[in-house]
Amino acid sequence: MKKQRIVVKIGSSSLADSHEGISKEQLSDHVAALARLKEEGHEVLLITSGAVAAGFSALGYPSRPVTIKGKQAAAAVGQSLLMQAYTEEFRKYGIVTAQLLLTRSDFSRKEQYSNAYATLGELLNRSALPIINENDSISLEELTFGDNDMLSALVSGLVSADMLMIFTDVNGLYDKNPQKNEDAKKYYFLPEVTEEIASLAGDAGSKLGTGGMKSKIDAAKTALSLGVSVFIGTGRGQEKFVDVLKGKGDGTYVGNAPQKEMKMNKQWIALHSVVSGQIEIDAGAATAIIQHGKSLLPAGVTNVSGFFQVGEVVEVMTQQGRVIGKGQCTYSAEELRDVKGMQSQHIQARGERHSYEVIHRDHWVSL
């Protein structure tokens, strides 16, 4: 089996015990299986939930707290307990772990996004196993973030993973809730996430987690768009993750055909960047960009909205108001208003610029 880069996401329901916080038995089972992946020569990243579940009992809560302050207090206590438990278990296999706590802002800010990419790459080059969690104790987003499901998809795209394995307490995707419907049909393989499939998932999570099957389907759709195939399911024992790679996993495989990888900069533009303005373009420019993969030139710009600086991300729309994509603009809004509709040779005659693309195709994402 060739070396692969694997992101494994373990949810609260697959890790925690409702009475004791962290289930040592379940955690040991996961670590043993992750160690087997490493033993087979694969690069492994772990996205783990469970900080809130690990910490609430230590603070004297009888069950998972429902208030924001309670959840964040439990996470502040639980994150250190969770990481300590992982570190001790992985040490038995001679595996060095590294902790990364991320928030949504780490993805939306380009410099921090690039730093996360560089750090993860260096850790993998050094054979460490990164353990990643949302920074629950300060981030409100995590509490409605889908139990780290979307985080796992975004990380898998960032590191150009070969596969994302989302482990939960349900063995795959069904056309109905299998706990309530005996005739529920299981999907063993889905080539893509269609609107029909997305509509089948409910919103409810487990008692310990915040993410239901809907968040997992949304995460799978995002991962596929980034060139990463997905497995959603469950399992026990040391071979469970290796079995997934062999096609023997107890769950649903989603889009396991080779996917087209999206480069890091385009991932940031597509999924994380903040839109600072809008550019309206004519039909000829829209055709050149969408059908022929060309860069956007000033001649095709008909209107500029907003106040943005060089390098900021803008939406591009047709004269009919349809948004066709977004990209990093090489002009400020003020500069672009001055040259919109002008041919490149006329701008060149001014002697003001060396580059004339408004948005270069390498910094463009179609929507």
Swiss-Prot record:
UniProt catalytic activity: L-glutamate + ATP = L-glutamyl 5-phosphate + ADP
CDD domains: AAK_G5K_ProB (cd04242), PUA_G5K (cd21157)
Pathway annotation from the record: Amino-acid biosynthesis; L-proline biosynthesis; L-glutamate 5-semialdehyde from L-glutamate: step 1/2
UniProt subcellular location: Cytoplasm
Positions annotated to bind ATP: 9, 168-169, 210-216
SUPFAM superfamilies attached to this UniProt entry: Carbamate kinase-like, PUA domain-like
UniProt xrefs under PANTHER family: GLUTAMATE 5-KINASE (PTHR43654), ISOPENTENYL PHOSPHATE KINASE (PTHR43654:SF1)
Family: Belongs to the glutamate 5-kinase family.
Designated name of the protein: Glutamate 5-kinase
Organism: Bacillus thuringiensis subsp. konkukian (strain 97-27)
